[in-house]
């Protein structure tokens, strides 16, 4: 077994010097408050969005179920993304907002903790799982929905400090 390197020559941290996948050793990092916010959208037909808003779908309250699914997704991130550390999240908030002007549901997730590694993947996973849940609950009436624009919006904490998407 080879010793893990801090990063490969091209800056990748999840590979050792021999190119093997490794979980990054964060034991030497300082614990700091870390927050990440991610966002995304589910685009759909106007009638589908109307049915969501009016709670007229057979599977129930789409926004509430998707909100819970997003929270659960954030908590299960290390089970889904192979090299993510299990984290003691102190906050997971998922908001789903209907946007009738653009026939979509806008999803925002905020994750926080005090720890040695960031929560970006947890926030992104929360958005993706919430979006997939919207799709699952509405696919009987609209198979053409699209999950779009899933991305990190901001992060704070750690040695890289604050970052905000432009």
Swiss-Prot record:
Q: Which reaction does it catalyse?
A: (8S)-3',8-cyclo-7,8-dihydroguanosine 5'-triphosphate = cyclic pyranopterin phosphate + diphosphate
- Pathway assignment: Cofactor biosynthesis; molybdopterin biosynthesis
Q: What is its EC number?
A: 4.6.1.17
Per UniProt, what is one Pfam family of this protein?
MoaC
The reply on keyword Phosphoprotein is no
Annotated substrate binding lies at 83-85, 121-122
InterPro entries given in the database record: MoaC (IPR023045), MoaC_bact/euk (IPR047594), MoaC_sf (IPR036522), MoCo_biosynth_MoaA/MoaC (IPR050105), Mopterin_CF_biosynth-C_dom (IPR002820)
GO MF annotations, alphabetized = cyclic pyranopterin monophosphate synthase activity
Query: What exactly does this protein do?
Result: Catalyzes the conversion of (8S)-3',8-cyclo-7,8-dihydroguanosine 5'-triphosphate to cyclic pyranopterin monophosphate (cPMP).
The family line of this record is: Belongs to the MoaC family.
Return the PANTHER family for the record: CYCLIC PYRANOPTERIN MONOPHOSPHATE SYNTHASE, MOLYBDOPTERIN COFACTOR SYNTHESIS PROTEIN A
User: What name does the UniProt record give this protein?
Assistant: Cyclic pyranopterin monophosphate synthase
Organism, by scientific name, is Rhodospirillum rubrum (strain ATCC 11170 / ATH 1.1.1 / DSM 467 / LMG 4362 / NCIMB 8255 / S1)
